[in-house]
Amino acid sequence: KDKARLLSQKGIDGFFLDNADVYYHYQIPEIYRGLMTLLHEIHKENKPIIINGGDTFISQAIKQNALKGIVNGINQESVFTEINFKDNTFGVKPIEDREYFLDYLDQCKTYGFTVYLLEYGPSKKIEKDIKAYCQSNGFIYDISHSLQLYKPF
């Protein structure tokens, strides 16, 4: 909580919480409670909170209606695309995996979250599909053709 306060005092305009997918790997009450405690502490700073990934945690918290008024949005990477980290290439997400994420994003939208997508290196056809899907659902998206997101383009 001290770090959240210090960051707020520095003038940040919101929090982007990464690695909430730890709950996917360790689906135990202690991890869930830890994430909820962290979110409640950060929320005290009255800044928007966006969670990156963490679909298993978010889905569980939605079932418990635990995030209303606390979390503003979610960012999901690689819904339509996927990354092969062994050779740093991009591909198309298998349809069954994509369907899972499309259902998840629909839950998030229905719950009231602002939804963000980040996709990597799609073909022109997949890029058109991503744009059409996001525009029809009111989602904010970015498409990167590089894994080096820290570099200006």
Predicted regions mapped to residue ranges:
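Glycan-processing catalytic domains of CAZymes
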Residues: 1-153
